[in-house]
């Protein structure tokens, strides 16, 4: 077998084309207008329109509304309850998502329970939740209740 040498390497047949010489007469195939047609902006040197140009009409990228903000990829959702919703519960009762669903205070859950401080804590409650606001914790403990943060 003959050894392969660099000077013997040639491109495959049909893979290389000669550069098309435009504007060099009729017989060359691309004479006179060089394949650009007759007159107009597109036939001129440097002619053409910018990307997105629609002939003077308001282009699509300007007709569409601008995006407002962005959407989170993995948004976190919580089940929210305010202290004013807990005013009808009996004193010293255990409060968590299950008991709130049973009592009819919540109709559905959408994540961990968060207790917010809107309203007053009238009775002592033992509340178990994932998060308490500072005002909610203060009002619950002032009424004699306890706040337990679940992991």
Swiss-Prot record:
Q: Where is the composition biased (Gly residues)?
A: 26-38
Superkingdom is: Bacteria
Biological process annotations from GO: translation
Task: Give the compositionally biased regions (Basic residues).
Answer: 15-24
**Which residue ranges are recorded for the region named Disordered?**
1-51
Q: Which molecular function GO terms apply here?
A: rRNA binding; structural constituent of ribosome
Does the keyword Nucleotide-binding feature in the UniProt annotation? no
Give the UniProt keywords, A-Z: Ribonucleoprotein, Ribosomal protein, RNA-binding, rRNA-binding
Give a yes or no for keyword RNA-binding in this entry.
Answer: yes
Output the Gene Ontology cellular-component terms. cytosolic large ribosomal subunit
The subunit structure is: Part of the 50S ribosomal subunit.
Into which family does the record put it? Answer: Belongs to the universal ribosomal protein uL15 family.
**Function in brief:** Binds to the 23S rRNA.
What name does the UniProt record give this protein? Large ribosomal subunit protein uL15
């Amino acid at each position: 077998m003959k050894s392969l040498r660099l000077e013997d390497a040639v491109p495959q047949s049909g893979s290389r084309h000669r550069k098309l010489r435009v504007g060099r007469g009729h017989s060359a195939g691309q004479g006179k207008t060089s394949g650009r047609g007759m007159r107009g902006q597109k036939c001129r040197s440097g002619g053409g329109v910018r990307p997105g140009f629609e002939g003077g009409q308001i282009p699509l990228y300007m007709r569409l509304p601008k995006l407002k903000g962005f959407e989170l990829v993995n948004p976190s959702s919580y089940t929210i309850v305010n202290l004013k919703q807990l005013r009808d519960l009996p004193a010293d009762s255990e409060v968590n998502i299950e008991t709130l669903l049973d009592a009819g205070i919540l109709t559905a859950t959408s994540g961990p329970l968060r207790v917010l401080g809107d309203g007053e804590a009238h009775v002592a409650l033992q509340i178990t939740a994932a998060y308490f606001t500072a005002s909610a914790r203060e009002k619950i403990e002032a009424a004699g209740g306890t706040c337990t943060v679940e992991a």
